[in-house]
Swiss-Prot record:
One of its GO terms (molecular function) is DNA binding. This is DNA-binding transcriptional repressor CapW. Residues 156-200 are annotated as: Probable ligand-binding region. Residues 131-211 form the WYL domain. Induction: Represses its own expression. Induced within 30 minutes after lambda cI- infection, increases until 120 minutes post-infection. Residues 208-299 are annotated as: WCX domain. Homodimer. Transcriptional regulator of a CBASS antivirus system. CBASS (cyclic oligonucleotide-based antiphage signaling system) provides immunity against bacteriophage. The CD-NTase protein synthesizes cyclic nucleotides in response to infection; these serve as specific second messenger signals. The signals activate a diverse range of effectors, leading to bacterial cell death and thus abortive phage infection. A type III CBASS system. Binds specifically to and represses expression from the CBASS promoter, found between the genes for divergently transcribed capW and cdnC (cognate DNA). Residues 96-207 are annotated as: WYL domain. Residues 1-21 are annotated as: Disordered. Disruption phenotype: Required for CBASS function; cannot be deleted from a plasmid encoding the whole CBASS locus even in the absence of phage challenge. It comes from Escherichia coli. Residues 1-15 have a biased composition (Basic and acidic residues).
Amino acid sequence: MPDNFREGDKQDSQKGRQGARWGQERRLEFIDYRLRWDGQINRSSLTDFFGISVPQASLDLSEYTKLAPDNLEYDMSSRVYRSTKLFQPVYMTSSLECYLNDLLQVAIQPEIHFGSFLGWRSPVAAVPRLLRRLDTDVVSQILRAIRENEAVHVIYQSMSDPQGSKRTLTPHSLVHDGYRWHTRAWCHKRGEYRDFLLSRIVQAQNAGPDEERANGDLAWNTFIKIILIAHPGLCLAQRNLIERDYAMIDGEIHLECRQALLHYLLFQLNLTETQSHQAPEALQLALKNKDEIYALLKQ
């Protein structure tokens, strides 16, 4: 089984190679990130992470100062550059979303040295995840079929057929529903596009070109607007709280979702037709255009 390795792992042994691969723009992103989230940076931060020389680190800091002169000031007593009150991030990689995602990766897989720009970090934890078995060779074959517009012969297991049976699929995309990986594919047995769990594909072999079916998934290519509101059964103060939680505009959130993925989204939001009968305090959100959405799910 291949090692679970990402760029940036085992940094102590790869500093020189990172420095060779990553140009100055990447190092400027690093400076921006560390100033935003650590509040400070010095030359050794750059030399340690990228394996570059001290003179090169000085040049990078000088270049960043030209780029955003109001973002940092030099503290002579500590010999570090500190972010100022006027700091405004230059790069999207310094966003709160990116930073929290970096922390989440550390919490989910603490045994892996994640290749992010994290310096000091708060203690962080995440609820354990159940990971499904994935066969590298199977996933590789599915990806090849997607790339080359080909069909694949597979053995697929399901709750109704736990031993597995032969099927021919023409996959066109991968899907993550928030919990599991699927491939979206034309099922030659059923004569329709369906989702197939990658963990339940036991074998996959090339079955030749099938470009026509690889591009004809109407439900995949159709985008549906979902309008979310604070649940009308909540009191005014509670609705205001929910609207602030989700940064609603005029009391609404507008999402676009592929029609083929609607059920997954509603399940995560606790808003399927079955789930929607719970107490308002449990649901918190509601579908403003629920009649339209539930009708689409029945198609």
